[in-house]
């Protein structure tokens, strides 16, 4: 039987500062590096055949916790990136709530019908 582990990236500066980061290439925080160390410990005895990551710094760095300790290559692809959020990239969530609250509500509740300038549209 095949087992697939989905691991969210460790804390990045966008999480810490509550900024909108989809394709924006944010960096891992000190807390994020501690989370990566904990992941490495958690998965130390787990067998992996492959490790995939998006091509964003925060995801590749988080994937270190698995691929490096298991001697595996890291396969990166933009096809597994978070959704691109266009003109919202690197703006504080609180600002977006004030300036584009209706679209933000749709993003949080009905992403299949959400779209913002320069961002991805899920049905595409």
Model region roles, listed by residue range:
Residues 1-5:
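Extreme N-terminal starter segment of soluble prokaryotic enzymes
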Residues 7-72, 76, 99, 120-123:
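Active-site-proximal alpha-helix that buttresses catalytic centers in soluble enzyme cores
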Residues 70-124:
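Phosphate-handling substructures
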